[in-house]
Each structure stands twice: as structure tokens, then as C-alpha cells.
């Protein structure tokens, strides 16, 4: 169990919001007593409270790509991370042994399509500094908690728990499972789609009882 918080759409000084981000993160520190980390950019702040499971020595977050342009804060476990790491090791230079760093490698190769490559439970916020855009996503059935909201200034806020948003967000709610939010689309997109979810694929749908 870890805790993540983030502030996006910052159009004034990010330094002014840093203290707010730290307060948001402190409220969920019980989720991750092993490490506290924060990234502050011009339009985004990402923070993380870590409970060490995989790679306790070097897996502190927010994770960053080697060039520092991709930043990730994530709570979860990626079950197929070894398989993905093997597939991507020639295209991406991994900086840690964290199972979650494969998300950065996948995003660099597939963009928002990275989410569909993941097998696991997760809630994450990823900031693409070079393109000034961000991606937020949650696992298929919502095993990992994640909440999203906004304030009167137009900032988008993210937290693993509602208490991270209380008093800062004027409107908030649960981040829908099996969806991602991409800043360039400005809307939620369902990424987890399976045939069995469609009624027309039920074999006996027309049979009368």
C-alpha cells in the first residue's frame, strides 16, 4: 500500500502550491511510511508516500526516466513487469528495479496505449514534461483507490484517499475503474473493454426462461 497525490493544470507559480501538495501528501502518509518524495515542475506537482515491496533500495518515487522528462507516481503492483521489462530493455534504460517503472517505458513507446499492456492493480499519475501533458489511470475493477477533483482556480487534484482532497478541492469523486484521463482529451476514456462486457456477446441472450 502506497499513497499518491498530484496537482495539475498549474497556471501560476508551482512554488506557491508546493506547500499544499505537501499537506495533501502528509494526510495519507500512513499509506507509505518508508519514503516520501515530491516532484515540482512548472505546471505539475507529483508526490508519493511509499511502502517498500519491490526494490526497496532504489524504487523511491516519483519515478523518473533517465532524461528526467517523464515523471510517475503510482500505487499498485504490476504483475507482468518482468515480461514487460524483458521486452523493453533494449528501447528504454531502466533506472530502478521497481515493477512500476515499466509504466514509463510503455508510455514512451505506446503513449496512452500503455495502460492496455499492464496486468495488475494500480492507480497512477504520469507527467510528460517535454509535451506538458499528463495521464492518470486506474486498474480494471478499482482494487487500488483513487480520487480526482478540481478547485476554483482550475487545478486538477489527485489523491489515493478523499482526505487528500478535503479542503482543497471544491468538487471531487472517485476515479472510475478501468478508465484513464488524458489531459489532451480532457475527458475520461474507458480503456478496459472486453467482449464479455457487451450484452450482444451473450450466447443465450435470446433464450426465454
What are the roles of these predicted feature ranges?
Residues 1-208:
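Cysteine-centered catalytic environments shared across enzyme families
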Amino acid at each position: 500500500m502506497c499513497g499518491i497525490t498530484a496537482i495539475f493544470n498549474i497556471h501560476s507559480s508551482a512554488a506557491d502550491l508546493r506547500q499544499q501538495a505537501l499537506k495533501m501528501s502528509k494526510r495519507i502518509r500512513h499509506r507509505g511510511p518508508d519514503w516520501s518524495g515530491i516532484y515540482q515542475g512548472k505546471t505539475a506537482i507529483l508526490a508519493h508516500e511509499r511502502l517498500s515491496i519491490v526494490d526497496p533500495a532504489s524504487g523511491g518515487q516519483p519515478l523518473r526516466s533517465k532524461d528526467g522528462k517523464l515523471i510517475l507516481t503510482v500505487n499498485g503492483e504490476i504483475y507482468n513487469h518482468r515480461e514487460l521489462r524483458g521486452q523493453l530493455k533494449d528501447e528504454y534504460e531502466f533506472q530502478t528495479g521497481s515493477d512500476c517503472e515499466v509504466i514509463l517505458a510503455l508510455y514512451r513507446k505506446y503513449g496512452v496505449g500503455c495502460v492496455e499492456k499492464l496486468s495488475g492493480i494500480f492507480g497512477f499519475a504520469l507527467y510528460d514534461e517535454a509535451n506538458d501533458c499528463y495521464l492518470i489511470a486506474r486498474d480494471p475493477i478499482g482494487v487500488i483507490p483513487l480520487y480526482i477533483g478540481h478547485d476554483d482556480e482550475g487545478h486538477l487534484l489527485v489523491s489515493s484517499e478523499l482526505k487528500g482532497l478535503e479542503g482543497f478541492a471544491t468538487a471531487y469523486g472517485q476515479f472510475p475503474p478501468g478508465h484513464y484521463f488524458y489531459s489532451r482529451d480532457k475527458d475520461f476514456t474507458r480503456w478496459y473493454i472486453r467482449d464479455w462486457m457487451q450484452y450482444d456477446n451473450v450466447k443465450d441472450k435470446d433464450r426465454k426462461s
